[in-house]
Amino acid sequence: MKNQFIKTTSLIVLFFSVFISCTSDSESDLSTDTDVDDVVITELHAAYAEFNTDATDIYLSNGGTTVTIETTGLPNHESVYWGEDSDLYLEESEVATTPSIMSSNNNAVTITVDATPNLTGSTVSTQLNTIGVAVSGASIFNDQEGNGALDEAAASLDWTGAHIGPGVYHYHLEPKAFTNDDKNLVGILLDGVFLYGRKCNSTDTYPTDLDTSGGHTSVTQHSDGIEEYHYHIINELYSTTGSYIAFTGPYQGY
């Protein structure tokens, strides 16, 4: 009877040892499987060649897992917001200008984005202030003005859908200075996804398969024949502006 008890006890101990060992292995495997390493790249995406080199400095960072964009924030196109002393000043009498003019002191922005956007995570809403950098070097903002709708400030937007505030020149609408009902590159957003004009390079017309963020996967003029996820300015007029919101969100690349 005593030997039987010892055998039974030994079997129970062995069972729990095996159970604990298997449970530990499973948890270790799960942890390993859910770890996603950052993708390392050695060359900048071809689209970055479109950016205004007088305003931007773009380089790989964090060992090639991210891209850093430093910009003066000063665009290479005309606007009333340059001020009359600038060669790029454009008289726009119909624009209810904000008090500021462009200055290198307050437009400078530095952003760091993933070199390869993570499209497997959750969507993230855009916030106020800079949500991306345009090819001109200026900032891109979303469809909000302060905590209200853009309608309240629409009269202050220049011919290319931009104005200054708070102290930063930025686009809210389709920036007609470099994209106007076409497939041109607009810029890069904070999630590392490129933003293009209203038309798609692969079809030369308005895409019909966009998600809620204005994104889809197709070949672009910068992807060397490979399909990649990117955003478009959605071809829907905004309010009474007669133009189109640059990007509302949410981000898909976080």
Regions found by a protein language model. Name each.
Residues 1-20:
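Sec-dependent bacterial lipoprotein signal peptides
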Residues 17-44:
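Bacterial Sec-dependent N-terminal signal peptides
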Residues 40-169, 173-254:
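A motif-centric signal for short, conserved binding hotspots located
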